[in-house]
C-alpha cells in the first residue's frame, strides 16, 4: 500500500503532501523535514530507496522511494508489499503525465496548477492503491475533467469522467 506521496523542492518546500493513512499535521511536517534532510544530501549516483527516517523507524515494513527531477523530489512512502522498481516506474508515469498535462512541467506549474496535479494523482492512486498506469488514459481523463466540469446540487464539482462511468454502470442509477 502507498501510505504517502510527497513532492517538495530542493529547499524542502512542499508542493504536494498526500497521505493515504491517518497522520496528524505536526507529524506530517516532521516527516517532510526528516525525509528532505535524508534525501537532499544524497548524490544522484546513490540508490533511490532509503531507510525510513527516525519518525518511521519503529515500523518495520515501511520503505521510502524517490526520484529527483530538476528542482523537485517525488517521494512515495510505501509498505513492504510494494515493489521498489514498480514504484520507481509509477513515479516516472506520474511525471510523464504531468509533463503532458502541463507541456513540459516545472515547479511553478505545480504551484499554480495544483488542481491538475491533484487530479493526475487521483487518476493514478486512490486510497493508497494504484488504479491506472496508462499515460494516455490518465491524460485523457484529466483533460476531460478539466474541460467538462459539472456542478452537483451542493455546488461542488464532479468530473465528467466520474459521471460517465456512473452512467455506464446504470445499475443503481438507472432505476
From Swiss-Prot:
The keyword Zinc-finger is annotated on this UniProt entry: no
UniProt-listed Pfam families: Clat_adaptor_s (PF01217)
Transmembrane intervals: none
Topology in the lipid bilayer: Peripheral membrane protein
Gene Ontology terms describing biological process: Golgi to vacuole transport; protein targeting to vacuole; vesicle-mediated transport
InterPro entries assigned: AP_complex_ssu, AP_mu_sigma_su, Clathrin_sm-chain_CS, Longin-like_dom_sf
Superkingdom assignment: Eukaryota
Entry keywords, A to Z: Cytoplasmic vesicle, Golgi apparatus, Membrane, Protein transport, Transport, Virulence
GO cellular component terms given for this protein: AP-3 adaptor complex; cytoplasmic vesicle membrane; Golgi apparatus; intracellular membrane-bounded organelle
Family recorded in the similarity comment: Belongs to the adaptor complexes small subunit family.
Subunit (UniProt): Adaptor protein complex 3 (AP-3) is a heterotetramer composed of 2 large adaptins, a medium adaptin and a small adaptin.
Function: Part of the AP-3 complex, an adapter-related complex which is not clathrin-associated. The complex is associated with the Golgi region as well as more peripheral structures. It facilitates the budding of vesicles from the Golgi membrane. Involved in vacuolar trafficking and contributes to hyphal growth and pathogenesis.
PANTHER family named in the record: ADAPTOR COMPLEXES SMALL SUBUNIT FAMILY (PTHR11753)
Protein name per Swiss-Prot or TrEMBL: Clathrin-associated protein AP-3 complex component APS3
Upper taxonomic lineage: Eukaryota, Fungi, Dikarya, Ascomycota, Saccharomycotina
Amino acid at each position: 500500500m502507498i501510505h504517502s506521496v510527497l513532492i517538495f523542492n530542493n529547499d524542502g518546500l512542499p508542493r504536494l503532501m498526500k497521505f493515504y493513512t491517518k497522520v496528524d499535521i505536526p507529524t506530517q511536517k516532521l516527516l517532510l523535514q526528516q525525509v528532505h534532510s535524508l534525501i537532499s544530501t544524497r548524490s544522484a549516483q546513490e540508490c533511490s530507496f532509503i531507510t525510513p527516517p527516525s519518525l518511521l523507524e519503529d515500523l518495520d515494513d515501511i520503505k521510502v522511494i524517490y526520484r529527483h527531477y530538476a528542482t523537485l523530489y517525488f517521494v512515495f512512502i510505501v509498505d513492504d508489499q510494494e515493489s521498489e522498481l514498480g514504484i520507481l516506474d509509477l513515479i516516472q508515469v506520474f511525471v510523464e503525465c504531468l509533463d503532458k498535462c502541463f507541456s513540459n512541467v516545472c515547479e511553478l506549474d505545480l504551484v499554480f496548477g495544483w488542481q491538475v496535479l491533484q487530479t493526475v494523482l487521483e487518476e493514478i492512486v486512490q486510497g493508497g492503491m494504484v488504479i491506472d498506469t496508462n499515460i494516455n488514459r490518465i491524460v485523457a481523463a484529466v483533460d476531460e475533467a478539466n474541460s467538462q466540469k459539472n456542478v452537483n446540487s451542493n455546488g461542488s464539482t464532479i468530473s465528467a469522467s466520474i459521471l460517465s462511468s456512473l452512467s455506464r454502470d446504470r445499475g443503481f442509477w438507472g432505476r
